C-alpha cells in the first residue's frame, strides 16, 4: 500500500488519491485529459470494487476453497476482463488513441491477473487486453518503476 507524506505534513494513503495528487502537480502525458472523468472513475471503481476481490480469490485460490480456481477466474473474466477486452478491441487505450489515468490505474491489476496462469492468459481469446497489457509491460515507464531492489536482510 503506497503512502505519500507531503512536506505540509499531509498524508495521502490511497493509490488513486496519490495518482490524482501527482497528476495535478504535473501531467506531461495528459492522462487526466485523455478520458472523461466520470467514465475513468467508473472503470477504476469497477476495478477496485468488483475486479480486485475476484482477482484476490483467483490469485490466492488456496485461501478461497469454496470454488475451484478456474471458477474464480471465470467470475473475474465475466465481471471485468471481458468488458475491458471488448473496449480494447475497438481502441488501443480505454478512451482512444492515448493512455488515460484509468489505463495506468488498471494495468497493474490486469498484469497480476495475467501472471496467475500466464500460459492460460496468453492462449485465451483476449486479444484486446493482451495487446494493451503488452504495450504497458514493454513501456519505459514500467521498466523504470519495476527496477528490482536488493533484498533486505531479515
Where are the regions that the model predicts?
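Catalytic and substrate-binding regions of cell-wall glycan-acting enzymes that process beta-1,4-linked
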Residues: 119-127
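GST-like domain detector, emphasizing the conserved glutathione-binding G-site
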Residues: 1-74, 92
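Long hydrophobic alpha-helical segments typical of transmembrane helices together
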Residues: 127-154
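Amphipathic, well-packed alpha-helical segments that form the structural scaffold of globular domains
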Residues: 56, 60, 82-86, 110
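Amphipathic alpha-helical packing segments from all-alpha helical-bundle domains
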Residues: 71-88
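Surface-exposed helix-capping loop/turn segments at secondary-structure junctions
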Residues: 86-97, 141-146
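GST superfamily/GST-like fold recognition
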Residues: 94-119, 136
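Structural signal for well-ordered, non-membrane alpha-helices
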Residues: 48, 52, 81-85, 137
Amino acid at each position: 500500500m503506497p503512502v505519500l507524506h507531503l512536506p505540509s505534513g499531509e498524508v495521502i494513503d490511497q493509490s488513486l488519491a496519490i495518482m490524482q495528487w501527482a497528476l495535478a502537480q504535473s501531467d506531461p502525458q495528459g492522462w487526466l485529459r485523455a478520458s472523461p472523468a466520470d467514465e475513468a472513475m467508473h472503470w477504476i471503481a469497477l476495478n477496485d470494487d468488483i475486479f480486485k476481490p475476484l482477482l484476490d480469490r483467483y490469485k490466492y485460490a488456496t485461501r478461497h476453497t469454496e470454488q475451484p480456481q478456474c471458477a474464480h477466474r471465470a467470475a473475474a473474466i465475466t465481471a471485468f476482463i471481458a468488458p475491458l477486452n471488448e473496449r480494447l478491441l475497438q481502441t488501443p487505450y480505454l478512451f482512444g488513441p492515448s493512455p488515460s489515468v484509468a489505463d495506468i490505474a488498471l494495468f497493474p491489476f490486469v498484469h497480476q491477473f495475467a501472471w496467475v496462469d500466464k500460459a492460460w492468459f496468453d492462449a485465451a481469446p483476449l486479444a484486446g487486453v493482451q495487446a494493451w497489457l503488452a504495450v504497458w509491460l514493454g513501456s519505459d515507464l514500467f521498466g523504470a518503476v519495476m527496477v528490482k531492489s536488493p533484498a533486505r536482510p531479515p
